[in-house]
Regions:
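Short, conserved catalytic-motif segment at the N-terminal edge
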Residues: 35-102, 126
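Short glycine/proline-rich turn/loop motifs
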Residues: 24-31, 87-98, 182-187
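Active-site helix/loop module of the DD-peptidase/beta-lactamase fold
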Residues: 92-94, 98, 106-107, 111, ...
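Short, compositionally biased leader-like segments
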Residues: 2-42
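Short, charged, amphipathic alpha-helices and their helix-cap/turn boundaries
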Residues: 85-90, 166-189, 214-218
Length: 218
């Protein structure tokens, strides 16, 4: 049955003893009543997380929930490795914890957009300005007029990196930025939408860094 779940349905195996794969950082979690919530509210949220985990779609789920700046939930369920559909039976199982790094990618787009609008509210940027106004090197290869707004709206004309770029390069922000500065836009018609799945975040991060001197990952 486990073989069918993994190889046919591409699902993770769910242990009978769920407590054995749950990690709760009790030292970080505050009493929910201190921020106007009930214990029942937290229990309901966590019960729904468990329901999602029990589908087997995700080998691990981590939850970090804050209210009024205080941590209400800092929890994890499942395995960081060893129980995924592609893992071999002899792969050592490693429990996920609240500290386990998770690759967010598009989930972080909302955070980046909020930061850009906060900078705009503070008068540090204008989203209608060209990216090159803040990062002149971005103007290479005909990108001098591409605006921050166009990048936010996935209309910047640079939806992807060159095909021969190694995924490992994405861990090097400076190297990726240099690639983006040297890439030619595939279109200049801002009415055309092309999802900037990866590229937009690197461009906006660089604007944030140029304006504030801070790294978005700091």
């Amino acid at each position: 049955m486990e073989i069918i779940r993994k190889q046919v349905l591409h699902l993770s195996a769910i242990p009978r003893d769920l407590d054995s794969v749950i990690t709760i950082d009790s030292a970080k979690e505050v009493d929910p009543q201190s921020v106007g919530m009930l214990h029942a509210d937290v229990d309901k949220i966590w019960d729904n997380v468990i329901k999602v985990y029990k589908t087997g779609v995700h080998p691990a789920i981590t939850v970090s929930l804050r209210r009024q700046g205080k941590v209400i939930m800092s929890r994890a369920i499942g395995h960081a490795r060893g129980n995924g559909p592609a893992d071999h039976a002899n792969t050592p199982k490693e429990l996920a914890t609240p500290e386990t790094p998770m690759c967010l990618f598009s989930t972080s787009k909302a955070v980046t957009a909020v930061l850009m609008h906060m900078l705009a509210e503070d008068g540090l940027i204008n989203v209608m300005d060209p990216v090159s106004f803040y990062a002149p090197e971005f103007a290479r290869k005909g990108k001098g007029n591409i605006t921050i707004h166009q990048i936010l709206a996935h209309r910047g004309g640079i939806p992807g990196l060159p095909k021969n770029v190694s995924l490992d390069t994405l861990w090097d922000e400076d190297a990726t930025w240099e690639l983006l500065c040297n890439v030619e836009p595939i279109m200049t018609d801002v009415s055309k939408l092309a999802y900037h799945a990866i590229t937009g975040g690197f461009v906006l991060e660089r604007v944030i860094r140029k304006v504030t001197g801070e790294n978005i990952n700091a």
